[in-house]
Structure formats: C-alpha cells, structure tokens
Amino acid sequence: LAMAMGDAVADAQARAMAAAYAIAGKEKEKLKQCFKDMTLAAIDYAKHKVEKHLFKCI
C-alpha cells in the first residue's frame, strides 16, 4: 500500500511537472532560473540556521 501511495505521488508530481513545462513553453528558461534561485535561497537559509546553531553551542 505504501509503495502504491508512493507511486501515485510520484505520478502526480511527474504530471504536474509535465503540465508546468507545457504551460511554460518559452518560459522554460525563466522557470529553470527560478528553481535555481529557490535552491540557492534554501541553501543560504540552511547555512544561516547551522551557523546560528553553532554560535549557540560555542
């Protein structure tokens, strides 16, 4: 059951991505840049959290 649920989620994600790309069309580059920016922001945020935690420990 858990595997079936996982497959359903993966399928839904794949369909959502396909739809997003189909809608985006020529916007694909902008979409890629957006994902890149979000990833970098997430990394910066995680680093900041880790550093803050480190300073608390010291």
Swiss-Prot record:
GO terms for molecular function: potassium channel regulator activity; toxin activity. It is found in: Secreted; Target cell membrane. Neurotoxin that causes irreversible rapid flaccid paralysis in blowflies and honeybees upon intrathoracic injection. Causes a quick and irreversible cytolytic effect (at 10 uM) indicating it possibly acts as a pore-forming peptide. Shows only weak effect on aphids (A.pisum) at high doses 24 hours post intrathoracic injection. In vitro, is not cytotoxic on the dipteran S2 Drosophila embryonic cell line. Keywords: Cytolysis, Disulfide bond, Ion transport, Membrane, Neurotoxin, Secreted, Target cell membrane, Target membrane, Toxin, Transmembrane, Transport. Neurotoxin that could be considered for development as an insecticide, since ingestion at high doses is toxic to both Drosophila (D.melanogaster) and blowflies (L.caesar). It is not toxic by ingestion for bees, aphids and weevils (S.orizae). Its main location: secreted. Expressed by the venom gland. The keyword Ion transport applies. GO terms for cellular component: extracellular region. Belongs to the formicidae venom precursor-01 superfamily. Residues 1-24 form a propeptide. Negative results: does not show effect on the activity of Kv1.1/KCNA1, Kv1.3/KCNA3, Kv1.4/KCNA4, Kv1.5/KCNA5, Shaker IR, Kv4.2/KCND2, Kv7.1/KCNQ1, Kv10.1/KCNH1, Kv11.1/KCNH2, C.elegans KQT-1 potassium channel, and sodium channels DmNav and BgNav. Disulfide bonds join C34-C57. This is U11-myrmicitoxin-Tb1a.
